[in-house]
């Protein structure tokens, strides 16, 4: 009987982290944006879309300065 409750607890835990939480844990969803929302050459970064040539470092979009 104890094994059944352990199995039930694990199953409930696994189903509770699916969806948005699992995507956020895997880094696929960040700040409400997913990669599809940002476009092909952009990525979600700290709640905003960070596009090329900028880079996402520690959840912050670092804007590359233009050469001119």
From Swiss-Prot:
GO annotations of cellular component type: extracellular region
What is the disulfide pattern of this chain? 38-49, 42-51, 45-56, 50-61
- Where is it mostly found? secreted
Q: Which UniProt keywords apply?
A: Disulfide bond, Secreted, Signal
* Expression sites by tissue: Expressed by the venom duct.
What span is annotated as the signal peptide, if there is one?
A: 1-29
User: In which domain of life is the source organism classified?
Assistant: Eukaryota
- Give its localization: Secreted
Q: Which residues form the propeptide?
A: 30-35
Q: Tell what the record comments on domains.
A: The cysteine framework is XXVII (C-C-C-CCC-C-C). Displays a mini-granulin fold, a structure composed of two short, stacked beta-hairpins connected by two parallel disulfide bonds. This newly described fold is derived from the same cysteine connectivity as knottins (ICK fold). The name 'mini-granulin fold' comes from the structural homology with the N-terminal region of the human granulin.
The role this protein plays is: This peptide promotes cell proliferation (EC(50)=17.85 uM) and inhibits apoptosis (EC(50)=2.2 uM).
- Hey, which family's this protein in? Belongs to the conotoxin G2 superfamily. 1 family.
Additional notes on this entry:
Negative results: does not show activities on voltage-gated sodium (Nav) and calcium (Cav) channels as well as on nicotinic acetylcholine receptors (nAChRs) (at concentrations up to 100 uM).
User: What's the name of the protein?
Assistant: Conotoxin phi-MiXXVIIA
- The record lists the organism as Conus miles (Soldier cone)
């Amino acid at each position: 009987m104890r094994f059944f409750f352990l199995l039930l607890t694990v199953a409930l835990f696994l189903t509770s982290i699916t969806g948005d939480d699992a995507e956020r844990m895997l880094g696929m969803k960040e700040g409400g944006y997913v990669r599809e929302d940002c476009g092909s050459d952009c990525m979600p970064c700290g709640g905003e879309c960070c596009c090329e040539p900028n880079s996402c470092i520690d959840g912050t979009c670092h804007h590359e300065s233009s050469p001119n």
